[in-house]
Structures are given as C-alpha cells and as structure tokens.
C-alpha cells in the first residue's frame, strides 16, 4: 500500500509523511522531487500549474506507485488536489489517501515561515481554488502536533501500532 499524504502546499505533507514513514518502517517519497524542471521554474516564477503541466508528473507518479507497491508499503507526500489527479495516481490500486486539512490562514502562516522551498505563498489561493476535498480519505486536522496527526493516521489505517 502507498499512503498518499495530500493537501495544499504548507499543510505539512512532507513532515507528517516522514514521521509516518519512520513510524511504519517504510520508504518515504516526496512528489515535489518528481516535478519536471519546467514545472519547478513555473512555480518559482509565481505561475500556477495547469492540468497539462501536471499530467506528465502524475503519470510518472502513477508508474512509481506501481513500483513502490511491488517493493512493499511506502508513504508519498503529494498535493493530489483534484479527484482527477487522484484517479490517475490510483488507477492501478494500492493507494490510500490521508488528507491534511487546514484553514487558509493557518496554511498561509506556515508558508510565510518556510524557507528553502520553491512554492511561493502567493500561489496558495490557486491551490485552494483547485482543491477538491476527497471523500475517501482519512482526514487529519493540521492544527494539532505532528505526533498527534501521525497517531490519528496510524489508528485510522490500522498498521504500525506499537
């Protein structure tokens, strides 16, 4: 199973994903690392990605998900904002979504505090506009400590209990 930690930029996908992967003893991957250079340049310039920009990235992730499932469980941090994106990534099964949900104000503050990341805070509005909250995900509020979020996820997915 690949557990996909999803949500808008700044919600804590990477941090929660890394802690969850360590807790489960599985590999962690960050979908940001699979963006083509053209997408990175576009985001760094403050231009939102469109569905055509995202399609090759999502197809690449879908292939990696098949590979990761063959190797065992894994955790992937990925925005997965739209249902159509989730459909591409999960079309061959073996995925479970964990949605990190937070208010725009909380997320904006996190982005303002962040350094060394290529996602400008002013793209947040476009992410919230694109966001189609999932109906088939574990929903975790981001306004609680990281360890509490991970404990909630572990309880919901039923693996990794000490």
List each language-model region with its residue ranges.
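Hydrophobic anchor at the beta1->P-loop junction of P-loop NTPases
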Residues: 5
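Conserved substrate/cofactor phosphate-moiety recognition/catalytic segment
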Residues: 18, 22-60
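Conserved lysine of the Walker
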Residues: 13
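Conserved phosphate-donor/acceptor-positioning beta-strand/loop module used by diverse small-molecule
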Residues: 90-110
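Small-molecule kinase domains that catalyze NTP-dependent phosphoryl transfer to phosphate-bearing small molecules
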Residues: 113-154
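Walker A (P-loop) ATP-phosphate-binding motif of ABC ATPase nucleotide-binding domains
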Residues: 2
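Loop/turn-to-beta-strand initiation segments
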Residues: 71-74, 96
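P-loop (Walker A) phosphate-binding loop of NTP-binding proteins
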Residues: 8
């Amino acid at each position: 199973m690949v557990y996909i930690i999803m949500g808008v930029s700044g919600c804590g996908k990477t941090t929660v994903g890394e802690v969850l992967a360590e807790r489960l003893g599985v590999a962690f991957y960050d979908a940001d690392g699979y963006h083509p250079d053209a997408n990175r340049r576009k985001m760094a310039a403050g231009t939102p990605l469109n569905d055509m920009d995202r399609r090759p990235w999502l197809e690449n992730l879908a292939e990696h998900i098949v590979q990761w499932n063959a190797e065992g469980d894994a955790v992937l941090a990925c925005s997965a904002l739209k249902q159509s994106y989730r459909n591409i990534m999960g079309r061959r099964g073996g995925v479970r979504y964990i949605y990190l949900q937070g208010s725009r104000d909380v997320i904006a503050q996190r982005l303002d505090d962040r350094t060394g990341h290529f996602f400008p805070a002013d793209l947040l509005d476009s992410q919230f506009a694109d966001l189609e909250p999932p109906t088939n995900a574990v929903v975790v509020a981001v306004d609680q400590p990281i360890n509490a979020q991970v404990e909630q996820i572990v309880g919901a997915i039923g693996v990794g209990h000490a």
